């Protein structure tokens, strides 16, 4: 058996990511397409320089979410496949910052492939608190590990507080994927034609591999 053939294929991990660059809370009636345009999350998630995203690998799943208020919750409205961060390549350009000035403080990218978004409002997304209530410590890899070890925080709502992203357990990935698929069936996906009209880096697009 060759060395390459003997390697065990890596199972993609899944993360839920608060895509917004600020801590403001959205209204439930915010159209998803407006959030996508504002953040540019059709092709990248942005991170601060001090928190350069080293843990994300090619093919990992990124579920995109936004904090909402009245009532308070976190709603997942889209997903995409990640590309591993490469220093230099995945940094905001002057043109990027001119278009979205906040990227001066959030210049590090995780590029995204095959984005899918609910074609509706943020309210049509999947409420993350429902998953946390049902799965409890089995929501995140960190809380599941803490429960197994008998120490540390096992409350998923506390674990997520002020964290830009959290790794999901396989159970949580399955739970969230099923309900997001249901949201796509109910409300549709934002079309590739619509996404193609948004700003894209040169050589990049909604069908990029």
Which residues are covered by each model-predicted region?
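Short beta-strand or tight-loop elements
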Residues: 58-60, 108
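Compositionally biased, charged N-terminal/linker segments
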Residues: 1-58, 70, 166-209
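Aromatic- and Lys/Arg-enriched surface recognition patch
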Residues: 73-77, 81-170
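Short, charged beta-turn/beta-strand-edge "cap" motif at the junction between a beta-strand
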Residues: 66-72
């Amino acid at each position: 058996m060759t060395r390459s053939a003997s390697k065990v294929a890596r199972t993609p991990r899944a993360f839920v990511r608060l895509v917004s660059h600020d801590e403001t809370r959205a209204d439930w009636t915010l159209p998803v397409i407006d959030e996508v345009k504002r953040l540019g999350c059709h092709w990248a998630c942005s991170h601060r320089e001090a928190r350069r995203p080293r843990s994300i690998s090619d093919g990992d799943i990124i579920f995109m979410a936004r904090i909402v208020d009245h009532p308070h919750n976190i709603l997942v409205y889209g997903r995409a496949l990640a590309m591993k961060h490469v220093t230099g390549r995945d940094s905001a350009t002057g043109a990027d910052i001119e278009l979205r000035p906040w990227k001066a403080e959030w210049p590090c990218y995780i590029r995204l492939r095959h984005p899918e978004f609910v074609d509706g409002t943020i309210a049509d997304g999947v409420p993350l608190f429902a998953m946390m209530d049902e799965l409890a410590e089995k929501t995140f890899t960190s809380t599941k590990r803490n429960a197994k070890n008998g120490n540390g925080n096992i409350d998923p709502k506390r674990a997520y507080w002020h964290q830009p992203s959290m790794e999901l357990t396989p159970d949580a990935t399955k739970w969230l994927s099923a309900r997001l698929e249901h949201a796509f069936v109910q409300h549709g996906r934002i079309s590739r034609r619509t996404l193609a009209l948004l700003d894209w880096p040169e050589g990049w697009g909604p069908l990029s591999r």
